[in-house]
Amino acid sequence: MAIDFKEHIASVKDFPNKGIIFRDITPILQDGKLYRAATHELAEYAKSRGAEVIVGPEARGFIVGCPVATELGIGFVPARKPHKLPREVESASYDLEYGSNVLEMHKDAIKPGQKVVICDDLMATAGTLHATKELIENLGGEVVGAAFYIELTDLKGREQFPDLDIYSLVKYHGA
């Protein structure tokens, strides 16, 4: 029997700001069976895309992507916030509602031609996905898919990537 992950995501009104509904995945993470099941679904997706490495943006992308890579027996590459990596990095900036941010990866993190699936907790406006994809491609990798626990469809992030295969465990339409 398939799991309805939406039943296990907490919706918190007016967080972090009034008018926002925060979709909280921690109930899934706190239940080992649910966490394993969510990981397995994303791993099956990544496997179907031929992933050779998983990339996860800081911070919840680590929580989502690391166990996927472990299940598949492939590597995990973190896309970090600035000044967190000790060696030479590639950087990409992206816009947020309230400003901009930067992600970085080690320049040797992705091999040319390597097939990559990006894993993260949530896709909203897709700013983080844009920056992560740009980093991977600048390093010579091929983004073959992106996988999320949650997709907020009203924010139309998916529409920005007509040629990218995107998988989500749960989709929210409106509030």
Swiss-Prot record:
Pathway: Purine metabolism; AMP biosynthesis via salvage pathway; AMP from adenine: step 1/1. Keywords: Cytoplasm, Glycosyltransferase, Purine salvage, Transferase. SUPFAM superfamilies: PRTase-like (SSF53271). It catalyses: AMP + diphosphate = 5-phospho-alpha-D-ribose 1-diphosphate + adenine. One of its GO terms (cellular component) is cytoplasm. It is an enzyme of class 2 (transferase). Its EC number is 2.4.2.7. Gene3D superfamilies: 3.40.50.2020. It comes from the Bacteria. It is found in: Cytoplasm. GO terms for biological process: adenine salvage; AMP salvage; purine ribonucleoside salvage. InterPro entries: Ade_phspho_trans, PRibTrfase_dom, PRTase-like, UPRTase/APRTase. GO terms for molecular function: adenine binding; adenine phosphoribosyltransferase activity; AMP binding. Its main location: cytoplasm. PANTHER family: ADENINE PHOSPHORIBOSYLTRANSFERASE. Homodimer. Catalyzes a salvage reaction resulting in the formation of AMP, that is energically less costly than de novo synthesis. Belongs to the purine/pyrimidine phosphoribosyltransferase family. This is Adenine phosphoribosyltransferase. The lineage of its organism: Bacteria, Bacillati, Bacillota, Bacilli, Lactobacillales.
